[in-house]
Amino acid sequence: MMEIKETRIYRIPSQNNIDPIDLFVTWYGEHRSQVVIRCWDKAWTAYWGGHWVEEVERFLLMDNIEYLVTSLARTRAHQERNWLKNIIKSIQQYLKAQGFEVAA
């Protein structure tokens, strides 16, 4: 059983024609995290057992939007994937404004 080390919640205001977003990060330690993204009446989740950097927020800032969309998308529908891509861009903009830096 994995022990939860920390849970962080980000309330991201509406920006770039995207409704407000709730980002829930559960950190299990040792580069292991789960992310839940909620926007409007939809939610997406993904678990990473090794995301190269300690803070998953920095991992979310890497130039890997297509990988994130594939990890989070519930369907292969073009409309959902495009919406999720814009949501991830909004999350990235917010995290950068909060002082998180892109992982090297």
Regions inferred by a protein language model and the residue ranges of each:
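Intrinsically disordered, low-complexity regulatory segments enriched in Ser/Thr/Pro
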Residues: 31-70
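Amphipathic, interaction-prone secondary-structure segments
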Residues: 2-46
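Mixed-charge, Lys/Arg-enriched low-complexity segments
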Residues: 57-104
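Detector for methionine-enriched segments
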Residues: 1-2, 62
